[in-house]
């Protein structure tokens, strides 16, 4: 358990280093590469640690709690750091390369703010739905299998990590980031609707199934 805690701290520290670089360094191609690598490494360590814990049965309530806490802060922090970058360098991320050009000002800033809200809402939706299913007799969710996993690759935190490769390309990053937001928003809305329906549907009893 102690080793798992240490690995969680290392993963969080690497992700934090990526956030610090994003906050302090100018938006160059090199900055984007460094940030993407740090984010991907931090996420990869966290994901691998979780897989090992599940396979070996070494997971514990404390470890699972810590993992969820770190995850709940990691992605929103990335979006907030992106917001700071947009505020600090509006002329770099604007299509017209001016402080008041499109998409500049509040129009540009609204994107990471909306992404932060979407991420927080989706995380709460996932965790709360899981807990409610454990405590109440509701219909089981559909799994969707490997096809759904492939279709939902844009929802994976690893995808978010790697788009920062484009951080040094200004408006191209904004375009890719906006596309990722729209794809995530559509998927989250569908996911929330599906969860609401399954939670509102009582589980079938053996007599009903017969």
What are these regions (language model features)?
Residues 69-210:
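A feature for the membrane-embedded catalytic helix bundles of lipid/isoprenoid biosynthetic enzymes
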Residues 10, 34, 38, 66, ...:
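Hydrophobic core positions of alpha-helical segments in small-molecule transporters
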Residues 2-5:
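Short, small-residue-biased leader/transition segments that mark boundaries at the very start
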Residues 61-69:
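Membrane-interface alpha-helices at helix entry/exit sites of multi-pass transporters
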Residues 7-8, 64, 171-174:
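Short, solvent-exposed positions on alpha-helices
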Residues 7-62, 79:
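Membrane-embedded alpha-helical segments that form the functional core of polytopic membrane enzymes
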């Amino acid at each position: 358990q102690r080793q798992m805690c240490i690995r969680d701290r290392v993963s969080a520290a690497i992700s934090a280093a990526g956030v610090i670089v994003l906050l302090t360094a100018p938006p160059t191609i090199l900055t984007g590469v460094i940030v993407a690598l740090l984010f991907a490494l931090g996420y990869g360590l966290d994901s691998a640690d979780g897989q090992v814990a599940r396979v070996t049965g070494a997971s514990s309530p404390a470890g699972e709690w810590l993992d969820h806490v770190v995850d709940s802060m990691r992605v929103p922090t990335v979006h907030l750091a992106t917001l700071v970058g947009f505020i600090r360098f509006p002329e770099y991320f604007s299509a017209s390369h001016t402080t008041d050009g499109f998409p500049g000002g509040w129009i540009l800033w609204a994107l990471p703010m909306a992404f932060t809200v979407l991420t927080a809402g989706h995380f709460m939706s996932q965790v709360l739905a899981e807990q409610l299913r454990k405590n109440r007799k509701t219909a089981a969710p559909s799994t969707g299998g490997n096809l759904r996993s492939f279709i939902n690759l844009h929802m994976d935190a690893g995808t978010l990590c790697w788009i920062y490769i484009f951080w040094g390309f200004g408006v191209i990053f904004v375009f890719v980031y906006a596309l990722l937001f729209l794809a995530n928003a559509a998927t989250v809305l569908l996911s929330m609707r599906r969860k609401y329906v399954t939670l509102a549907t009582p589980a079938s009893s053996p007599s009903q199934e017969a």
